[in-house]
């Protein structure tokens, strides 16, 4: 006889509903008005390895091709912009915003390979092609080593700073006893990428100051720095997609040399992995291996810069809308990495003497930013304002939209003579100044508030945009000349008769 039994499997209930994030195309209406904006030539010069301090401050900054360049581009408020058509929107029911539809990052200076290194680099043996290695007995076997680091081209566009990740020293549990010299626990840290932060040069995304106390394991430019790598996973999973609309990336490297580290091996090789040796080979030599990277050949055929890019659909929900009238351009370009060596003599020389010559090194970078922006408008409906307030509460404040305070139900005190010395001072407190939430971070400020132009055909990127959308500029008006009348004085030729 068939008997019905309830299922023994678990029943999974659906998760509680959450507020849905919608794309900006659902509440942003685009117009047919476009503007071009471009920066001037942006230059920076400094020392490629470390800052130089002469009077207690960084008189010569650190400028390296392995630094992030993070441009914070300031845009004018479109609601206070002088528009050609004042009827384009209703200020009582709508607000205007900018949408980035095209950009071009110009790079100057020639292609070049830059070398970085350390005069006291921790290397013991050449493990690629060396003689028989024995146990390290010298207390200091550091050597002068230079490398051409990893080659990187990167560009991240968004209206919020890009997010980076790196490993640093974590906190050990109280139940785990630690002593001096133990391997520290690791912790993955997320932080905004700032202008001047170091990129991954092939030695990992680490806080080298905290994790390598020997100060001899990596080149000079990162030995006391933190190398960050963009956290593409976190930015792609961002609910609103403000930190990364899209990105361009090209990385390449290979290994040039193979070394091992000198020092005491903190974690010995298990005995079952080898057979003991003799003649200074017990215990075995250092098994902490390290490879020096190389960025390989640099060509103009693999350049990401000096060409236009058009934004049709962003990877996230923000389809190029510049909230708070700003956008962030994060750039890395190690293909223009020439470190210029300069020399100056201390006195006039008749014969060459290297002790009378001072050597210097400098690195220079050159940028130019061009954009095409589209004017858009947002309807101030109750649903849209509630959504924007949840996403970013400062937007409504910048648009001079606030909530009216409720009617006071308690009894308030009102003095008759407010300027009398007999009562407490009745002077109103000044409202607190609006604080920039990103003021503690370092960016390269680029002000484009006075650089907007509607004449797109007057700029290189504007002409490329007009060609992209299929709009041709009108030819200049030319005055028509009267054609001179021609009078033939010769007799008309008679037709040849057919025979």
UniProtKB/Swiss-Prot annotation:
Record's keyword annotation contains Disulfide bond: yes
Location(s), subcellular: Virion; Host nucleus
A GO term for molecular function: structural molecule activity
Protein's name according to its UniProt entry: Major capsid protein L1
The protein's assembly and partners: Self-assembles into homopentamers. The capsid has an icosahedral symmetry and consists of 72 capsomers, with each capsomer being a pentamer of L1. Interacts with the minor capsid protein L2; this interaction is necessary for viral genome encapsidation. Interacts with protein E2; this interaction enhances E2-dependent replication and transcription activation.
Record field: transmembrane: none
Pfam families: Late_protein_L1
Superkingdom of the organism of origin: Viruses
Homology family: Belongs to the papillomaviridae L1 protein family.
GO cellular component: host cell nucleus; T=7 icosahedral viral capsid
Renumbered residue ranges of the record's region Disordered: 472-499
Keywords associated with the record: Capsid protein, Disulfide bond, Host nucleus, Host-virus interaction, Late protein, T=7 icosahedral capsid protein, Viral attachment to host cell, Viral penetration into host cytoplasm, Virion, Virus endocytosis by host, Virus entry into host cell
The species this protein was found in: Human papillomavirus type 53
GO biological process: endocytosis involved in viral entry into host cell; virion attachment to host cell
SUPFAM superfamilies membership: Group I dsDNA viruses
Role noted for this protein: Forms an icosahedral capsid with a T=7 symmetry and a 50 nm diameter. The capsid is composed of 72 pentamers linked to each other by disulfide bonds and associated with L2 proteins. Binds to heparan sulfate proteoglycans on cell surface of basal layer keratinocytes to provide initial virion attachment. This binding mediates a conformational change in the virus capsid that facilitates efficient infection. The virion enters the host cell via endocytosis. During virus trafficking, L1 protein dissociates from the viral DNA and the genomic DNA is released to the host nucleus.
Biased composition (Low complexity): 484-493
